[in-house]
Structure formats: C-alpha cells, structure tokens
Regions:
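Post-transcriptional modification and biogenesis factors for structured RNAs
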Residues: 1-112
Length: 112
C-alpha cells in the first residue's frame, strides 16, 4: 500500500523480548476475559496496547499479571469476539479520540 513509508514495524520474539527492549509506563491488554469495557480506559500518549492471537488471545498468565490493565470490547453473548483487525481498529480509534485525534485530519470538505 502507499502508506507503508509512514509505518515503523518492530518485531519481537515474545512478550519477554518486548519488555526487555521497551520501558512501559502504561499499557492496556485487550481481551474477551477482561473485567471492563475499553471505553472505561483512560488512554494516554505513549501507552502500549496488547492484543493476542485471534485463536487464543493473550496468555492467561500475562492477563492475570496485568489484570487491572485489561479491557474488553463488548460483544453479543452468542459471539466469541471481533476479528483481530477490527478489535485493533475499534480500540486504537477510541485511544485516538481520547487524545483528540493527534496529527489526523478531523474535518471533511465537499467537492465544489
């Protein structure tokens, strides 16, 4: 796509590798097993968002260790979860909304 030049991709072996290489002051874990909605989180600039695999989610020991930082996207009782890309989009846009959409155009213009 034509916007890859705006993306910085970093690859980590696992969660331990990530934490060894980054200083994490604020984080949120998005999981179907979380106690509260993502809309209850107060997202700040520089926070990290963690999402697990579509098939398994984040490891339960990781969720237990960071339970106060776990949030969920409300779902119908008969549906398991959103797919990963949709869950990321929903959560990231809520975080950006709370930060007043920094560096994003927040207006539109009709063609004349």
């Amino acid at each position: 796509l034509d916007y890859w030049h705006m993306v910085e991709v970093r690859d980590y072996e696992n969660l331990e590798d990530f934490f060894a290489k980054n200083q994490v002051e604020e984080m949120w874990c998005v999981s179907t097993k979380a106690p509260r909605s993502y809309t209850e989180a107060a997202f700040h600039d520089g926070c990290y968002l963690f999402f697990g695999k579509e098939t398994k989610g984040l490891p339960e020991d990781f969720l237990r260790a960071h339970y106060d930082a776990c949030v969920r996207i409300p779902m119908r009782p008969d549906a398991r979860s959103l797919n990963l890309s949709n869950a990321v989009a929903v959560t990231v846009y809520e975080a950006l909304r709370q930060l007043s959409f920094p560096n994003l155009r927040d207006f539109g213009k009709m063609r004349e």
